[in-house]
């Protein structure tokens, strides 16, 4: 009889680990306390509500949503995160009729507008007046956390006052990352390697030759070395497969000559011919197997020579001053970057988030820490 997947220990363990990871992820990476609390409570309620479900496809959908939750948190996609949360908050069943009657307001009692007893859904609509603008949404969450619930902010005030502050906050995060990288000191130069078969191709890695800046010559060397290594490996495997067929052919000829098969085993024959101790091996076996072993030795020597060549090139990287060249180049790059940062820092008191010419983004572009196409497009 097939057991329900909920009773399988590995399934339960996996789901529990994923659930705990999601809770930790919410605490660590969600930018605002309000959203943290809402996601935390929604996730716990959804797990409690669905822990006894037996339908496989339904549970699969829940696990996929859990995967999307962590993906949106890590990717800082607030809009999709809120949409996923709303999907589960809207699934909560309405209260029973007696409770609904009890929640109706008593006639004759006037409720003031600034009491702040708005529902989560109303608050969410008010907090996200502009879809697709994650920076502004996060800023509004913090704004309402500090100043409390108020009436809906006019669109004009959002565009002219709050949006520039939200964009300024984003540029501040970029500035903090730049300051952190500069505080770490000059970028490091290292000798890295990549595998090509059994060989290791060594090269200098620095900010000047990373990713798209990597030398085309080095890229060509790596590609050719890997193709040659794969070709040698294919030939070696072909020789290994031919060894057994050669042994069978030799066994057949031996049987035709002596009217009975040779009692020697395949591994014993190959081992003795390899070691050169083949005096007691019939000549017909040596004639068939030895040429293949010689081809395999040639391939092994080619592989060993390739490894030795790349090892020598690694030593040349240090002895030939190439390592020192990139190290000094990094020092000069860091010095120029530090000078630009100090110039940027001197102009920070003059920044104004509400002007296009003097905002922090324009300052980052001026001192070449951002490209013009990386600026946030201000909507109006």
Curated annotation (Swiss-Prot):
Entry keywords, A to Z: Mitochondrion
Quote the subcellular location field of this record: Mitochondrion
Is Mitochondrion a UniProt keyword of this protein? yes
Identify one Gene Ontology CC term for this UniProt entry: mitochondrion
- Function in brief: Essential for respiratory growth and required for mitochondrial protein synthesis. Required for vacuolar acidification.
Tell me the protein family, please.
Belongs to the RRG1 family.
The name this protein goes by in its record? Required for respiratory growth protein 1, mitochondrial
Species of provenance: Kluyveromyces lactis (strain ATCC 8585 / CBS 2359 / DSM 70799 / NBRC 1267 / NRRL Y-1140 / WM37) (Yeast)
The gene is RRG1
């Amino acid at each position: 009889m097939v057991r329900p997947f909920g009773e399988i220990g590995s399934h339960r363990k996996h789901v529990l680990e994923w659930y705990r990871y999601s809770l930790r992820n919410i605490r660590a990476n969600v930018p605002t306390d309000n959203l943290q609390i809402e996601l935390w409570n929604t996730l716990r309620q959804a797990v409690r509500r669905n822990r006894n479900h037996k339908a496989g496809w339904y549970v699969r959908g829940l696990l996929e949503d859990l995967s999307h939750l962590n993906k949106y948190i890590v990717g800082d996609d607030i809009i999709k995160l809120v949409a996923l949360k709303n999907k589960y908050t809207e699934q909560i069943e309405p209260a029973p009729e007696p409770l609904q009657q009890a929640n109706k307001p008593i006639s004759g009692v006037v409720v003031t507008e600034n009491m702040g007893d708005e529902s989560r859904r109303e608050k969410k609509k008010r907090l996200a007046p502009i879809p697709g603008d994650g920076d502004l949404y996060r800023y509004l969450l913090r704004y309402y956390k500090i100043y409390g619930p108020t009436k809906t902010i006019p669109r004009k005030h959002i565009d002219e006052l709050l949006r520039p502050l939200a964009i300024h906050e984003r540029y501040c995060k970029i500035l903090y990352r730049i300051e952190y990288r500069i505080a770490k000191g000059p970028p490091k130069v290292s000798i890295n390697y990549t595998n090509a078969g059994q060989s290791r191709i060594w090269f200098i890695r620095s900010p000047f030759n990373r990713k798209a800046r990597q030398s085309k010559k080095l890229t060509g060397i790596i590609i050719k070395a890997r193709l040659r290594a794969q070709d040698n490996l294919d030939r070696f495997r072909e020789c290994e497969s031919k060894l057994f067929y050669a042994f069978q052919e030799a066994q057949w000829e031996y049987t035709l000559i002596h009217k009975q098969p040779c009692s020697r085993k395949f591994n014993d024959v190959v081992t003795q011919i390899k070691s050169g101790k083949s005096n007691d091996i019939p000549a017909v076996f040596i004639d068939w197997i030895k040429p293949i072993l010689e081809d395999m030795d040639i391939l092994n020597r080619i592989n060993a020579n390739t490894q030795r060549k790349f090892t020598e090139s690694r030593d040349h990287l240090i002895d030939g001053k190439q390592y020192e060249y990139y190290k000094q180049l990094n020092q000069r790059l860091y010095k120029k970057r530090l000078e630009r940062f100090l110039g940027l820092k001197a102009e920070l008191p003059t920044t104004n988030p509400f002007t296009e010419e003097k905002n922090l983004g324009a300052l980052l572009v001026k001192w070449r820490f951002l490209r013009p196409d990386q600026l946030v497009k201000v909507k109006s």
